[in-house]
């Protein structure tokens, strides 16, 4: 059965601190076009590769990869909250396949996902509960982190199962590209911050609001050029998008963690979600991909990109 892929940057700042109206309209046109493609494809299963921003996964036990057998969206930054319609049998089959391929993936029956997953579902399908879904968490902010190569191999293991499914499957990669929002780090953190990174589940509304206000303030400073956050890197972003477009996925294996942080910022590690999604698609053979959008948007502290792809034999359908 056919497989369709959509990869897109996410931003929690949309609606909180926006660029010029013309830029917002531009992004929303790209998002509408992506949703129209998804509507036309009418998936029977959605697999979302997404990061987390210390809303669902913490240093008490920080897996590199985790597949949700049951999941709930926490609703941060105004994103949708509530249970996801997880396709449990499919989730467990994907976990078995990953483990059989020597990818040590965790499984959660109480996964919490944040805007990194929920926003992608809202933008691309209209709501978080429209289609059966399997959420796949990829650690992208909490060192130590697995390599891009491991993310590609995770995608390949999942994709080989997807290729045998008798249903239409939508693959989503949510995150990236160059960006470095003010995500706290456990290295050098004081006791209060460290405890939040270790066991910060289910924060109070006041605590969540304070964190969101801090992020908005950081975005204002970044857009004004008054910030120590890593600058956006459009040239790096375009090189990454182009390697995905031409199907040169093993080139991503050479993107070391140190180089990603140095060249594109500490949260650019979210490119792993794109690498995994494309790895899953490539497991079915050559694909045809399109770079649909790219713009560096400082108000959102994001190199904002979008791509879609299909198996090459189906790309004209």
UniProtKB/Swiss-Prot annotation:
EC category: oxidoreductase
EC numbers, comma separated: 1.13.11.16
One GO MF term: ferrous iron binding
Gene Ontology biological-process annotations: 3-phenylpropionate catabolic process
Pfam families: LigB
Named cofactor requirement(s): Fe(2+)
Biochemical pathway: Aromatic compound metabolism; 3-phenylpropanoate degradation
Annotated catalytic residues: 115, 179
Catalytic activity, reaction form: 3-(2,3-dihydroxyphenyl)propanoate + O2 = (2Z,4E)-2-hydroxy-6-oxonona-2,4-dienedioate + H(+); (2E)-3-(2,3-dihydroxyphenyl)prop-2-enoate + O2 = (2Z,4E,7E)-2-hydroxy-6-oxonona-2,4,7-trienedioate + H(+)
Keywords, comma-separated and alphabetical: Aromatic hydrocarbons catabolism, Dioxygenase, Iron, Oxidoreductase
Family: Belongs to the LigB/MhpB extradiol dioxygenase family.
Annotated function: Catalyzes the non-heme iron(II)-dependent oxidative cleavage of 2,3-dihydroxyphenylpropionic acid and 2,3-dihydroxicinnamic acid into 2-hydroxy-6-ketononadienedioate and 2-hydroxy-6-ketononatrienedioate, respectively.
Oligomeric and partner information: Homotetramer.
Protein name: 2,3-dihydroxyphenylpropionate/2,3-dihydroxicinnamic acid 1,2-dioxygenase
Source organism (scientific name): Burkholderia vietnamiensis (strain G4 / LMG 22486) (Burkholderia cepacia (strain R1808))
Upper classification of the organism: Bacteria, Pseudomonadati, Pseudomonadota, Betaproteobacteria, Burkholderiales
């Amino acid at each position: 059965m056919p497989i369709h892929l959509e990869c897109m940057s996410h931003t929690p700042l949309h609606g909180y601190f926006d660029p010029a109206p013309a830029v917002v309209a531009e992004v929303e046109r790209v998002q509408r076009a992506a949703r129209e493609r998804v509507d036309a494809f009418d998936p029977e299963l959605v697999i979302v590769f997404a990061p987390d921003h210390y809303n669902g996964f913490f240093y008490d036990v920080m897996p590199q990869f985790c597949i949700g057998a049951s999941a709930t969206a926490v609703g941060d930054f105004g994103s949708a909250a509530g249970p996801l319609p997880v396709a449990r049998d499919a989730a467990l089959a994907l976990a078995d396949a990953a483990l059989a391929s020597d990818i040590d993936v965790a499984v959660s029956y109480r996964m919490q996902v944040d805007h990194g997953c929920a926003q992608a579902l809202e933008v691309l399908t209209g709501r978080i509960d429209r289609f059966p879904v399997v959420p796949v968490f990829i650690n992208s902010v909490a060192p130590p982190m697995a390599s891009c190569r491991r993310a590609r191999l995770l995608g390949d293991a999942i994709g080989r199962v997807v290729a045998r499914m008798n249903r239409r499957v939508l693959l989503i990669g949510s995150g990236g590209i160059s960006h470095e929002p003010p995500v706290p780090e456990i290295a050098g953190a004081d006791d209060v911050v460290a405890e939040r990174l270790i066991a910060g589940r289910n924060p109070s509304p006041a605590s969540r609001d304070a964190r969101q206000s801090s992020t908005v303030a950081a975005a204002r400073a970044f857009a004004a050029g008054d910030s120590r956050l890593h600058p956006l890197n459009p040239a790096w972003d375009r090189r990454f998008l182009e390697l995905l477009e031409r199907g040169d996925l093993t080139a991503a294996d050479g993107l070391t963690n140190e180089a990603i942080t140095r060249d594109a910022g500490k949260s650019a590690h979210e490119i792993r979600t794109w690498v995994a999604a494309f790895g899953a698609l490539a497991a079915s053979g050559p694909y045809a991909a399109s770079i649909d959008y790219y713009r560096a948007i400082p108000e959102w502290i994001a190199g904002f990109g979008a791509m879609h792809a299909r198996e090459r034999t189906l790309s004209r359908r």
